[in-house]
C-alpha cells in the first residue's frame, strides 16, 4: 500500500515526527485542533513569500511554542526582531487570546532544493506564470539533483498546457522506495491556480534511510571529500523567559 497511503502518516514514529505535540482531553481536543489549523493557515497566508516549509506546534501548560522552518528567515524576523513581535500578536489575535504566551523559533531550511514543499511551491509558481509544465518539472529535477537528493518523484495533474482533457503525468529520478518504512520520504502537495483551472502537484523526495541503532539518517548528498556545509541560521525567541 506504499503507493496509495500518505508517506508521512505511514512513517509516523519511524522516520517522521508529529507536527503537533500536545495532549488534551476529549473536551478541549477539538478546540486545540482548530487552533493549530488556524495558526498554520494564518502563517502560510501572511508569510507565503518567506518560503515556509513547515510549522511545528508544541504546547506546555498555557504556553504555545512554534517552530517555523523557512528558506528566508530574515523576512519573518525583520529588523531587530520586529517581525517576531508582529507575528506573535497576529497569532494571539487569530486564536482569540491576547494573554496566551507564544514562543516562536525560526529555523532556516538547510537545503532549499531538497525540501518537498519548497519544490512543490516552486513548481506551482512557475505553472502560474504559464511556463510549460515539462520545462518546469525538468528545472525542478535539476535543482534537486544539485542539492544531492537520492531520489525524486514529481506528479502534475489537471489541464496541462491548457488541454481540453485533464490528465496526470509524472516523472521520477533516482530511487523513491515508498514501501521501505526506514526510508525518509519528504512528501508535499500544492495547487497551482492557472487560467485554465487548478493543477494538482505532488512531490516525493527520498533523503536517505534510517539505519538500525542510529538516530541520524544517511546525509543527503554526503561525500567524504566535501567539507560540511555552513550551519543553518536559527533565531530563538527568548522574550518570555524573564516574564
Curated annotation (Swiss-Prot):
The record's annotation in CDD domains points to: KH-II_30S_S3
Residue ranges for the region (Disordered) are 216-243
Sorted alphabetically, which keywords does the UniProt record give? Ribonucleoprotein, Ribosomal protein, RNA-binding, rRNA-binding
KH type-2 domain location is 39-110
Q: Carries keyword RNA-binding?
A: yes
Give residue spans, biased composition: Basic and acidic residues. 233-243
Q: Does the keyword RNA-binding apply?
A: yes
What biological-process GO terms show up in the record?
Answer: translation
> Which InterPro entries does the record match to this protein?
KH_dom, KH_dom-like_a/b, KH_dom_type_2, KH_sf_prok-type, Ribosomal_S3_C_sf, Ribosomal_uS3_bac-typ, Ribosomal_uS3_C, Ribosomal_uS3_CS
Q: Which HAMAP family match?
A: Ribosomal_uS3_B (MF_01309_B)
The family assignment reads: Belongs to the universal ribosomal protein uS3 family.
What is its quaternary makeup? Answer: Part of the 30S ribosomal subunit. Forms a tight complex with proteins S10 and S14.
Could you identify this protein by its name? Small ribosomal subunit protein uS3
Q: Native species of this protein?
A: Prochlorococcus marinus (strain MIT 9301)
- Which taxonomic lineage is given here? Bacteria, Bacillati, Cyanobacteriota, Cyanophyceae, Synechococcales
Q: Which gene encodes it?
A: rpsC
